[in-house]
């Protein structure tokens, strides 16, 4: 009777060891689910505390007025500063959103056609200004707009601005704030758009090149449609942030000692002004609700027209 010989499997023992280590590294499914529930609960809790609750309270303040239901909105609409504040913010956002959309998408498409290392260097350079956000960015621009201290003083003098107050004349404020917003925010969106372009299958781009499509046709007919949702996403967040413009005109107005920049240039500033100077929290809440409604309306239109949540 012959005894069957054991056949050695090359690397079998090593495979067993690797398998045992892999099994040891596996986490129970319950722990992953618990962690997921924890982070979702944390997000929902913070959203309710810092997002939903203030909105509900603002609506309550705006509607509960001793002079009658909705009188706070009437006061806000009748305020002589209401229309100019919204004209300012709409002019600013029109300049900023159009310029940001065209330049961010254009620069991203250009960087995507460059060599990997060269594109990485430019993405980093574009992203650097985003590190100076808020008041820090405005302080930088205080020097940039001062003809006596700016490194671009020759440009300011060429435009006819001999003093700081000339540069920040009321008619220049909307473009100035648009440049500030683009300076701090464009780099981050370029990185986001570049990541979206990298998700396009390389085979699709090769097929277009084989079919004779040049760089412009590839960008227009293939790349842009495939990153359309990211462009809409950028517009939604940018519009929501733009309606809340506050720091830039406040700091710039303080530096100019109130000359050229009013204390209620933007609706957000106006809401703060009536609340802090007149203790009229109901009107301030009404202005906040108007800004919220405007943001939600524009976001809904962009999401609907851009088919942001449709599966492809």
Regions found by a protein language model. Give the residues of each.
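Short, Lys/Arg-rich, polar N-terminal cytosolic tail immediately upstream
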Residues: 1-31
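A structural signal for multi-pass alpha-helical bundles of membrane permease subunits
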Residues: 32-312
